[in-house]
From Swiss-Prot:
Homodimer and homotetramer. This is Polyphosphate:AMP phosphotransferase. Residues 18-222 are annotated as: PPK2 1. It catalyses: [phosphate](n) + ADP = [phosphate](n+1) + AMP. GO terms for molecular function: kinase activity. Uses inorganic polyphosphate (polyP) as a donor to convert AMP to ADP. Can also use GMP, UMP, CMP, TMP or deoxyribonucleoside monophosphates, with lower efficiency. Cannot use low-molecular weight polyP as donors. Can also catalyze the synthesis of polyP from ADP or GDP, with lower efficiency. Lower concentrations of MgCl(2) are required to obtain optimum polyP synthetic activity, whereas higher concentrations of MgCl(2) are necessary for optimum PAP activity. Belongs to the polyphosphate kinase 2 (PPK2) family. Class II subfamily. Its cofactor is Mg(2+). Optimum temperature is 50 degrees Celsius. It comes from the Bacteria. Keywords: Kinase, Magnesium, Repeat, Transferase. It comes from Acinetobacter johnsonii. Coiled coil: none annotated.
């Protein structure tokens, strides 16, 4: 290469670096703005095609303080986890760039190539469809996704293996694949063509061109982050409000059998959940003072604290608002045992809808996003049990007043609780739509009238036993 050509190449690299840094800072400046975005870069490809070198070069061209890289070898799918679960904790906040060097597509290929029970074509394509739907949900929630496949011909791969330093011979069978095996190479290439039609394909033959093309693809993505799904709100058809939300029986006098029945059921529930090899997620929603805390207390009464996690959900923190609204729930589903939510992801279609924190387009879209989320859980050996605890307005007022006059319960009542009563009917309408759009065979709603606290607690425990048995019978 002559001096003039070298000088031109250096100049081009300097300009590319400057362009990348400017685009990087432009993205950072969208944080907390109406046009806020983040970028996820999924990197996969043939080994020795230069993925690692391209990522290292990218770090030299951008401001490395604000480029995040998560690098993991592919692993087989865990049947008790949705495909996205190992990664969602690392979803970037607004203004951030995250490279996932190793991602769910690598896991899909590893599973298809190595699992003792190979994936058939239908299941493989179902995974791809679910992955694309998840990526679209990310995009709709301001996380753009760039997918890059580094390719390399069989001939070039073999030459690079021949030229390798003996100390790096472990690459020969990296990730369990024998890269000297032409049949395995061909199988991998055939499989990846079933999902890379919407990927940027980078030819790994020429090192300089490879690095430049990778950086250029990222620059293009940063400069042209699309406005995803900015659709007009639908003409909304309000669902009818179920009678159980408005018609309540007068609470009965204390049942003489209540304590013995409660004792029996708490033990049965503990035994059933403890002996079940699936994960159990129990979700509570309902009006304030409807008895969510009391019901949860009875559910865990016979369990050891090490067997369960309880998450009490309040208004999101600022760092949570900078990510998709489901992110703070994805990150709370790490337990392999029992997880209980005192308020849930349904805040998107309840309080965020009623109080105007979510736009009409956002809360209308959320029903489908939530259904996909719950379907992913259900398909990953998780029993999802959802409760709405219903109470009438007069009983709620009586419980509020009782809290105010009880020293150890005063902390449970605030001015906001009283103010929310002004929007009672709006919350009922939101709840009715929620039931209409998210009551599914894999995650049904149990609506429990709680004017009678004792009867409500019994019904909650019975419903848990019923759902555990129903899901087991359909497995």
């Amino acid at each position: 290469m002559d001096t003039e050509t070298i000088a031109s190449a250096v100049l081009n690299e300097e300009q590319l670096s400057l362009d990348l840094i400017e685009a990087q800072y432009a993205l950072m400046n969208t944080r907390d703005q109406s046009n806020a975005k983040s970028l996820v870069i999924l990197v996969s490809g043939i080994e020795l095609a230069g993925k690692g070198e391209a990522v290292k070069q990218l770090r030299e061209w951008v401001d490395p303080r604000f480029l995040y890289v998560k690098a993991d070898p592919p692993h087989l799918f865990n049947l008790k986890q949705p495909f996205w679960q190992p990664y969602t904790r690392f979803v970037p906040a607004e203004g951030q760039i995250m490279v996932w060097f190793g991602n769910w597509y690598g896991d899909l290929l590893a599973t298809a190539m190595h699992a003792s029970k190979p994936l058939d074509d239908t299941l493989f394509d179902e995974y791809v469809s679910n992955m694309r739907a998840f990526e679209q949900d990310l995009k709709n929630n301001n996380v753009d996704v760039l997918k890059v496949w580094f390719d390399l011909s069989w001939k070039s791969l073999q030459k690079r293996l021949d030229d390798m330093d003996p100390s790096e011979v472990h690459w020969h069978k990296l990730h369990g694949l024998d890269w000297r095996n032409k049949k395995q190479y061909d199988t991998l290439q055939k499989l990846r063509t079933r999902f890379t039609d919407d990927w940027q394909i980078i030819d790994g033959e020429d090192e300089d061109l490879r690095n430049h093309n990778f950086a250029q693809a990222i620059l293009t993505a940063l400069r042209h982050c699309p406005e995803h799904e900015k659709k007009a709100a639908l003409k909304w058809q309000q669902a009818p409000i179920p009678d159980i939300l408005t018609q309540f029986e007068v609470p009965q006098a204390e049942d003489a059998n209540y304590k013995s029945e409660l004792k029996k059921l708490t033990k049965q529930v503990a035994d059933a959940m403890r002996c079940d090899d699936r994960k159990v997620v129990i979700a509570f929603e309902g009006m304030d003072a409807a008895g969510k805390g009391g019901a949860i207390k009875r559910i865990v009464k016979k369990l050891d604290p090490r067997e369960y996690e309880i998450h009490t959900i309040a208004a999101p923190e600022k760092y949570e608002l900078r990510r998709p609204y489901l992110w703070r729930f994805w990150s709370k589903l790490q337990s392999d045992d029992i997880t209980i939510f005192d308020r849930t992801w349904y805040g998107r279609v309840l309080v965020e809808r009623v109080e105007g924190f979510a736009t009409e387009v956002e809360w209308q879209r959320a029903y489908a996003e939530i259904n996909r989320f719950e379907k992913n859980l259900s398909s990953s050996q998780t029993v999802l049990i959802k409760f709405w605890l219903a109470i009438d307005k007069d009983e709620q007022a009586a419980r509020f007043k009782a809290r105010e006059s009880t020293p150890h319960k005063r902390f449970k009542i605030t001015e906001e609780d009283w103010r929310n009563r002004d929007k009672w009917d709006d919350y009922l309408k939101a709840a009715a739509d929620m039931f209409a759009h998210t009551d599914t065979s894999y995650a049904p709603w149990y609506i429990i009238s709680t004017n009678d606290k004792q009867q409500a607690r019994i019904e909650v425990l019975r419903a848990i036993l019923k759902q555990l048995k129903a899901d087991r019978d359909t497995d």
